[in-house]
């Protein structure tokens, strides 16, 4: 009896948990993408940023994400991405000084779909409000960019 009750409850949870609301006409899917573009390292020779930047922008334009998070973005790459992706608002700062030094972890969003309410950055360390601080045995400073 105990097993039958448990089985009935589990079947009910599975049945009702798998139900899906019907989408309304106003609903739009949210396309999200993350992309580690690799920093601009002169030692990359044939894979140098100057050879990759157009293809990076083309790939993003092809997938057209509404929200885009990136990693390993240097300041010059951030400037190139802003120029190559004019339909996006770009947010982020360098991890070493909170301005331009060090890699960025920027957030890009489609300007025509979202309205920026608030944004900021914090360090992944024991002192999150101080940019440029290493934490928890990290080899490099780590930073996060957020937006509402």
What do the PLM-derived regions correspond to, one by one?
Residues 67-148:
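Structured beta-strand-rich core segments of catalytic domains in phosphoester-bond hydrolases
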Residues 11-13:
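Repetitive helical segments and hydrophobic/amphipathic motifs
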Residues 6, 16-84, 95-103, 121:
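N-terminal, active-site-proximal structural segment of metallo-dependent hydrolase catalytic domains
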Residues 1, 49-50, 139:
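Short alpha-helical segments used as structural interaction elements across diverse proteins
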Residues 1-7:
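Bacterial N-terminal signal peptides that target proteins for export
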């Amino acid at each position: 009896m105990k097993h039958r009750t448990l089985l009935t409850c589990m079947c009910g949870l599975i049945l009702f948990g798998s139900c899906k609301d019907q989408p309304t006409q106003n609903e739009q899917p949210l396309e999200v993408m993350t992309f580690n573009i690799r920093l601009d390292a002169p030692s990359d020779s044939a894979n140098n940023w100057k050879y990759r930047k157009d293809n990076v922008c083309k790939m993003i334009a092809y997938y057209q994400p509404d929200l885009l998070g990136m990693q390993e973005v240097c300041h010059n790459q951030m400037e190139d991405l802003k120029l190559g992706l004019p339909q996006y608002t770009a947010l982020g700062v360098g991890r070493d000084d909170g301005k331009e030094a060090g890699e960025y972890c920027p957030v890009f969003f489609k300007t025509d779909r979202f309205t920026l309410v608030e944004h900021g950055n914090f360090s992944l360390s024991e002192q999150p409000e101080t940019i440029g601080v290493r934490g928890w045995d990290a080899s490099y400073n780590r930073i996060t960019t957020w937006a509402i």
